[in-house]
Amino acid sequence: IVKDIPQLSLKGGAVQGTLVTPSAWLTETAAADPESSTEVWAKHLADHGYTVRAPRLPGHGTTWQEMNSTVWQDWYAEIERSFRELSKTCDKVFVMGLSMGGSLALRLAEEKGNGIAGLVLVNPAVHSERQDRHLLPFLRLVIPAFPGIVNDIKKTGQDEGGYPKIPLKAAYSLTHLWAAVKADITKVDQPLLIFRSTDDHVVEPSNTAWILANVASKDAEEVVLHDSYHVATMDNDAETIYDGSADFVERILAERS
């Protein structure tokens, strides 16, 4: 477990910024591993001249026990703080996120409106179809954690740095984030790009389908990834995501110039 790693902040030459939000339960959020999904994604965007922040969220990059002492409002507060910091120096801010990071990105878009120029989501989650999900409110009171799915990556030799267990109190709080996102989803009207893996063992495809069916975005696109699992930003389709994200930002900026 990697501890006490600062957030990643990269200064580009442009006055546009990108906020990259991470998945849950992952030490990748600490940007400790040069091959981590957050860092590589962020550096790719910085190479295109954008100022990038990839914040380390409370409870991330430490231990699952510490994660279990946090709630979704703690994670969101850090995302919001990073957004405010970017907005001080950047005329336009794009928000990108993987898995739970996608949930947080959607919530930020709902609350910040036209303060966000566009969204890029990778295998975003707004609900779960697990049969045991209805037991979570009760299980969290008696069991601290369940075994988790770690390294859902098709490409060999990759390590996302995930926690070996899912902290149940934090997972229960995540369901409240999903509820908040779903309640206000029609407020999302920014340009939207979603990358979805066809073979994802963590987030069901119904999540992306629901998001696209309910957002108010007139500019919304889904890109299907055929050679990656859940952590697609570290998988065989990573370059598709990196290049597609940069192209998306460039297109939106050109259309608004």
Residue ranges of predicted features:
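Short, surface-exposed "cap/lid" segments of acyl-processing enzymes
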Residues: 1, 17-57, 63
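Catalytic nucleophile-loop/oxyanion-hole region of alpha/beta-hydrolase
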Residues: 63-89, 94
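Gly/Ala-rich beta-loop-alpha elbow adjacent to hydrolase catalytic centers
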Residues: 97-101, 105
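Active-site nucleophile loop of the alpha/beta-hydrolase fold
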Residues: 120-129
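Short beta-strand/loop motif that positions the catalytic acidic residue
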Residues: 188, 194-196, 200
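Conserved alpha/beta-hydrolase "acid-adjacent" motif
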Residues: 201-207
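Catalytic histidine neighborhood in serine/cysteine hydrolases
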Residues: 215-231
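Catalytic active-site module of serine/aspartate enzymes centered on a nucleophile-bearing elbow/loop
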Residues: 227-257
